[in-house]
């Protein structure tokens, strides 16, 4: 566990480290009332919210007040805070953030789906604003379809009969492998960040058709979020546009939008230990939100994506 003293020492040793990014580009369309940023994280004071020793990376802090500033600039009224991998199954930081933000916030938690848990625990978390659990196969380095399928099966069994959904951070080959499981599941699925599509590989890359089919059939939602994880063409990531438009065309009732703020650098970096500070990526969320008007030019479609879909899925 990294102590606050160690964190401050590391930050002092690297004075170029920036704080969580804020939008630099003004929003160029009318954001509808009730709009929701469906993908964010909070990284709290490490002394109060210790990170799991097995984490892949150590981010800089990103606090609730910084998120409030972000959302004022983006005209976002609602937010979904997703439990990051650095805390494992200790959801305290995420739940504290939801508590601070009140009824405008919901959470996605991480639980141990391999171990039977109590329904009371889920009920308590539901009352605190949790609406689903996350399977973060990507950050965990899980690419084996057999392992992924087993995790999905355990998660389905754990949530059977509840109103929660399963949110997955994975890549298209995994989605292709679990397509039948998702389509036949008694719970809803949400795939992060374009399902892990890589823009340079084009629309015909393996697995994207499976994602489209799941979205089209209503079995899964997809977040058109974190475009910089699919593309290197900053700041507008134009090569992501065909993917976003294809997903919106497939089923606009199953599309969500999110920033992925504060943009953690969770990738494995040669020579960087998991306890070394991984500077937050400096992403212009104003430019990213403006791209939604390119991906969904119709104002009614944007209202569906930003307001109606999140309200239905997260129970705002």
Describe the residue ranges of each PLM region:
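Active-site gating/metal-coordination segments in enzymes
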Residues: 86-173, 180-183, 216, 221-235, ...
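An N-terminally biased module of ancient metal coordination in phosphate/nucleic-acid-related enzymes
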Residues: 8, 21-89, 275
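Glycine-rich phosphate-binding "P-loop"
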Residues: 51-57, 82, 132-147, 274-278
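Hydrophobic faces of well-ordered beta-strands that scaffold small-molecule active sites
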Residues: 36-40, 79-82, 107-109, 133-135, ...
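H/E-rich (His + Asp/Glu) clusters that bind or coordinate divalent metals
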Residues: 21-28, 205-316
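Active-site phosphate/pyrophosphate- and oxyanion-stabilizing loops and adjacent acidic/basic residues
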Residues: 68, 95-96, 179, 212, ...
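Alpha-helical scaffolding within the catalytic cores
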Residues: 63-66, 90-93, 117-120, 175-176, ...
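N-terminal secretory signal peptides and thylakoid transit peptides that target proteins
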Residues: 1-14
């Amino acid at each position: 566990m990294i102590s606050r003293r160690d964190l401050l020492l590391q930050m002092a040793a690297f004075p170029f480290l920036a704080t969580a990014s804020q939008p630099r580009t003004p929003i160029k369309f009318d954001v509808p009332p009730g709009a929701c940023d469906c993908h964010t994280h909070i990284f709290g004071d490490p002394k109060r919210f210790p990170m799991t020793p097995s984490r892949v990376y150590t981010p800089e802090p990103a606090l609730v007040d910084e998120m409030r500033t972000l959302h004022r600039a983006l005209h976002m009224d609602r937010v979904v805070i997703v439990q990051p991998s650095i805390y494992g199954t200790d959801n305290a930081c995420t739940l504290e953030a939801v508590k601070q933000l009140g009824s405008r916030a919901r959470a996605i938690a991480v639980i141990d789906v391999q171990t039977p848990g109590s329904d009371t625990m889920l009920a308590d978390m539901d009352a605190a604003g949790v609406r689903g659990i996350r399977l973060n196969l990507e950050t965990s380095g899980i690419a084996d379809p057999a392992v992924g399928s087993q995790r999905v099966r355990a998660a389905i069994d754990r949530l059977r009969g509840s109103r929660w959904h399963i949110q997955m951070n994975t890549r298209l080959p995994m989605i292709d492998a679990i397509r039948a499981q998702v389509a036949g599941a008694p719970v809803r699925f949400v795939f992060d960040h374009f399902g892990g599509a890589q823009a340079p590989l084009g629309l015909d890359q393996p697995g994207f058709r499976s994602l489209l089919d799941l979205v089209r059939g209503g079995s899964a939602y997809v977040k058109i979020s974190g475009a910089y994880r699919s593309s290197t063409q900053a700041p507008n990531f134009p090569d992501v546009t065909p993917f976003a438009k294809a997903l919106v065309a497939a089923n606009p009732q199953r599309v969500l939008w999110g920033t992925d703020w504060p943009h953690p650098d969770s990738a494995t970096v040669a020579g960087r230990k998991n306890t070394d500070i991984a500077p937050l990526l400096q992403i212009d969320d104003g430019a990213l939100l403006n791209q939604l008007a390119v991906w969904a030019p119709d104002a009614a479609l944007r209202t569906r994506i930003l307001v109606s879909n999140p309200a239905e899925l997260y129970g705002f």
